[in-house]
Amino acid sequence: MGNDEYTKKLEKVIQELIRPIKNLPFHLIIKSLSGYEVDKFNPDDENHRITLEALKEVARLSCRLINKEGIKRKRANEVGNDIEKFVKEAFIKFDYKADKPTTSAGKKKSTGYPDLEFCVLDNQYHYLECKSYNVKNMNSSMRTFYLSPAKDFKITHPGIHFIICFEIYQDHREDDFNVYKTRGWKILDAYNLDIDLKYEFNSDNRRLYKPDLILAEEDI
C-alpha cells in the first residue's frame, strides 16, 4: 500500500472516530466499565423509599448549610466544586455514612465520577453525584455531566446512582468574589440518563517537548 493510500485510509478512520456517539444509556455504560449493575430506583421498594427520604433530609440540611456560609467563587460554573463538602457534612450530621468512593485498588479517590458513596441503611451502599445549576440554563445543551473511563474506577458494587442538584444564585459580592446561595434542590435517578461519547486527542510532556518539535528556546 502506497503512502498516499495509507494516509487517505487513516484520515477516514480519524473522521469516523471523531463523530460523537449520542444517547448511550448510562446504566449500560457503567455496567460495561465496572462490571456492576446500576439499580433503578423502585418506588415500591421500601428500602429505596427510605433511602430517598434520607436524601431529602440531606438536601434540606445542605441548603441550610450552604446559605449560612455562602459559596465564594468568581464564576457560577465553579460553584459545583464546593457543593460536595456541604452534602457530606449533612450526611454526617444525620449519622449516615458518606465518603469518597473506594476504588478497586482499595484507595479513596476524589477525582472523577461519582463524588460520594453513601449508606443510610446497614450495608446498602449507593452512589451520589453533586451538581449545581442555574434555573435559566435548565434547557441548555451545555455539557454539565462527565464520566471518564479509568483503570482504577470508583464503582465497585451495584447500587442506585443518585444525582443531587442545587439551584444556585448570586446573593452578593464580597472581597472581589461572588457569594452564591441556593433556593432549591432536585434529586435525580441516573439510571435512564442518556449520555454522549466524544473522543479526545491528547499527548504528554515527553512527546510535546521532544527536540525535533522545538523551534527556539532560551534560558534567562
Annotated model-derived regions:
Residues 91, 116-118, 126-134:
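Conserved catalytic cores of phosphodiester-cleaving nucleases, focusing on short active-site segments
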Residues 77, 84, 88-119:
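A short acidic/basic microdomain associated with nuclease active sites
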Residues 80-88, 161, 165-167:
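Short, hydrophobic, well-ordered secondary-structure elements
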